[in-house]
């Protein structure tokens, strides 16, 4: 919440509501809707915001962070870490909301269930080749680790256009990390890059679809035109194209699926 307010997003979240319902198996968009309250206090349609507006989506990305960690052998399925306040050189402390002062041993699924910031920070530090130790300085060179983390997030649809059959889709806002380790850690918990609601839907759908990222589509069929007020012959059925398969094993994907289920 503090990070959202600091970036001027707090009021936006109070004035807008957006929703996407998608079939993860074939990319069919079953429903897409949005509303926003304008400056005059009037409720307006904002369906287009689902693929033209972007937000920091917070802890929702943590499943993608784990997948990136698995891909790069930074962590293993079922790995246990201690959730604890992380104390860095210079007095910086970073912690989880569910466990602000204690020391709790959790595995990867439990990290998703509890929305552990610390598990994700420790994963990101391992990905950077600099595992956490109390009092350590933040890693100086995080450019390569940032690319690896973003590549993992891209594979599930975060930070890329979804390919929906509508114009003016935005890929989100992906700022240079410029070797800022604080921004790199924030990226691991969804507090740096911004994504569209449709990207978030594709991300969850990719995990639900066992790692296959499907191109979403509004249209279902194309028919030949006729001179009569009737539907012409079917020309083509629109099917969701497989855009990519995430570079993870079935066990790794299932681990994230189970962690998501434990969160609800």
Question: What do these predicted regions represent?
Answer:
Residues 2-13:
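Single conserved hydrophobic/aromatic residue that forms the stacking wall/gate
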Residues 1-2, 54:
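Short acidic-aromatic active-site loops that bind/stabilize oxyanions
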């Amino acid at each position: 919440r503090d990070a959202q307010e600091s970036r001027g997003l707090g009021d936006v979240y109070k004035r807008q509501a957006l929703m996407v319902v998608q079939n993860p198996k074939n990319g069919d968009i079953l429903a897409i809707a949005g509303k926003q309250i304008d400056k005059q206090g009037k409720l307006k349609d904002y369906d287009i915001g689902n693929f033209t507006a972007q937000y920091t989506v917070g802890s929702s990305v943590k499943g993608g962070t784990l997948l990136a960690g698995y891909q790069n052998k930074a962590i293993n399925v079922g790995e246990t870490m201690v959730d604890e306040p992380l104390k860095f050189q210079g007095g910086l402390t970073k912690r989880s909301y569910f466990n602000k002062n204690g020391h709790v041993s959790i595995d990867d699924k439990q990290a998703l269930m509890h929305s552990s910031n610390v598990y994700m920070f420790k994963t990101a530090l391992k990905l950077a080749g600099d595992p956490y130790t109390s009092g350590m300085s933040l890693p100086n060179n995080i450019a390569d680790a940032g690319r690896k983390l973003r590549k993992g997030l891209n594979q599930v649809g975060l930070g890329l256009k979804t390919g929906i059959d509508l114009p003016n889709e935005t890929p989100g806002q992906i700022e240079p990390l410029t070797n800022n380790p604080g921004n790199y850690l924030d990226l691991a918990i969804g507090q740096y890059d911004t994504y569209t609601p449709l990207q978030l839907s594709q991300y969850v759908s990719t995990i639900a679809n066992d790692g296959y990222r499907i191109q979403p589509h509004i249209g279902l069929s194309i028919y030949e035109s006729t001179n009569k007020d009737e539907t012409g012959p079917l020309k083509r059925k629109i099917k969701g194209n497989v855009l990519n398969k995430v570079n993870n094993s079935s066990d790794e994907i299932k681990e994230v699926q189970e962690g998501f289920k434990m969160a609800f």
